[in-house]
Amino acid sequence: MKDVIRYLAPVVACAILALPRIADAQSPTQIPPSITTPDKVDSRLGTLEFKDGAPSKATLDKVYDNLDFTYAFRAFTDNMRGVSIHAARKGLQSIGVKDNEVLIFSQLMDAKSLFLTANADTVYTMGVLDLTKGPMILEVPPKFLGTIDDYWFRWVIDIGPPGPDRGEGGKYLIVPPDYTGALPEGGFFVARARTTRVFWFGRAFLENKNDPKPAADTIRKFTKVYPYQAGGVGTPIAEFLAGKVMLGSVTPPPPTVFHEGSGKVMNTIPPNDWTYFEMLNEIVQQEPATSLDPELMGPIAAIGIVKGKPFAPDARMKKIMTEALAVANATSRSLFMSPRDPKWFYYPGSSWMNYLFETGYEFETPIPLITREGAKPFPPTGYRTMDARTNFFYGITGITPGMAMRLPGIGSQYLFALTDADKQYFDGAKAYSL
């Protein structure tokens, strides 16, 4: 027994010595203040309250109202471009121009037609291609400057001097998303769209002492819109013999329908009232679910606009979305009329600006420099300048690399100003000299 006690004594002593260390190991860790949430937080939403980190009912209401507000705000600022092109299509439809038909302003534009950035000294032509039944062909005339954008106003391909026809005119074959059918080996400038409809537009320049008639006549003579027939022109017989494609007929295309736009009353400008969300829903229902980046589609879905589902916000959401719409419109208009980034202006202190030189047509990387050795691209920035994109599509129609090229005689270069030499906004009731 003594031997047992003699054996256990050191063990008990060791256990007693170890007790403080066990107690130390079980004591709570000091929590850094940086990872805790205070019981009360003062914010622009008011006082937010948390009990042991758990939000109160009043806090939940404030936070979720604000979250839904931000989603509705972004649905406007990030996606105005889609509603803008939808509004343009609706404007054309309002005067009877259907998809795959052509609108031409033979006598130039005037104030009866509401467009964002139309000029009054070029002959405009435009239309919408419906790709739901397959690829469409657009034939364009020589000396015609234009572009094709998809239904989220993303660039597809240029027409004319900046495009593959280089001002000589030609046939453009526009292919819808997920098309797996046969395509020609030659004879067409082929471009794939990410949406089932695309908007094309361009202009011809005045000749013969500012007479628009020669340009308008050339447009009517050469412009054609018609469906692509697989296995026809552009498909060699060898492809058929190899079993790769069925032969199609080689027949003249159906006549293109033209509509006169000069003097017509139409509105192509996107709205900033509740109809904005209704039009945004129409686009989402019309286009493939994958037609827009998921990050951009996320806020749209968060406010209840989801492909294949009814858009029916309750009274709470409608109130929040209406307020967000007003703030988003005010923000977009402020960005357009008075940008805060000094790099967007042509030189320090100037009212003249064009941020595409700084951001490029994708609002990410400046346009390349043109040197004696050729084009000198800038490295990608890795981020998109969101304010520039919001600014651009709020006040301008169309996007293309050709809108910011340092190449004379190829594309277009723009400088615009919204204030006079005294930095006062232009007044439509006054006359100004340059």
Which residues does each PLM region occupy?
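N-terminal secretory signal peptides that target proteins for export/translocation
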Residues: 1-7
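Bacterial N-terminal signal peptides
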Residues: 9-20
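A compositional/structural signature for long, glycine/proline-rich flexible linkers
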Residues: 25-434
